[in-house]
Amino acid sequence: MPFTYNVVTGASADRLEKLIAERLGPGADKVAIDRRIWRLFGEKWAVLYTDLSGFSRNVADFGIVHFLQTIYESHRLLVPLIERDNGILLKTEGDSLLVMFRHVSDALRCAVEMQKCTQQYNETRIDEEKVLLCVGIGYGELLRIGDSDIFGAEVNAACKLGEDTAKAHEILITGEVSRTARLPPGSSLQALDTAPAGADSAFRLVYK
């Protein structure tokens, strides 16, 4: 099973570029154009963003081959879970994955399964080979540009939670996720002191 992904832009990106160019023109009705853009590309999705704790430090200490090994292993572990839980892997960036789910409950379930899978994997690995996963999840209206990219406040919030806020083994979610989703069995929420830009609140998912 391959774990390398190539995403090609197409008609959606071309259409968006034309609308943006029109929006930049003199006398453009920006409100009307914005409505057209949202009508064409606006969709509601759950967004899951993963990051690996301590990854950059390990690359500096152990070299590029270690980098490639860790990336490969994380994909090998996580991609089958994404597919099983009805996710769409939109893109990979270094040690991070950007994943979309139609249903928030699928995103939460997948996040818990990811954490349990990597923790089990780590039990038999030396420290520098462990996959220390951080996860952020958002949910809401976003602009989906074909299969090339997504934009929106909840996208930004999910990325901030996963990359900048979450520690190893943590799953952090936005307030919108907490209001929308049914939590996995046996789990609970702990409010965070601060929320990323684009979210009104944020929580730590305490899972079993």
Model regions: which residues?
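Intrinsically disordered, glycine/charged-rich C-terminal tails and inter-domain linkers
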Residues: 1-34, 168-208
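Alpha-helical scaffold within the catalytic cores of cyclic-nucleotide enzymes
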Residues: 9-13, 17, 69-86, 98-135, ...
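Catalytic NTP-binding/metal-coordinating core of nucleotidyl cyclase/transferase enzymes
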Residues: 12, 24, 30-109
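Short beta-strand
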Residues: 88-92, 127, 194
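Short, solvent-exposed loop/turn segments at secondary-structure junctions
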Residues: 99-100, 142-146, 180-181
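Catalytic cores and conserved motifs of cyclic dinucleotide signaling enzymes
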Residues: 145-149, 169-171
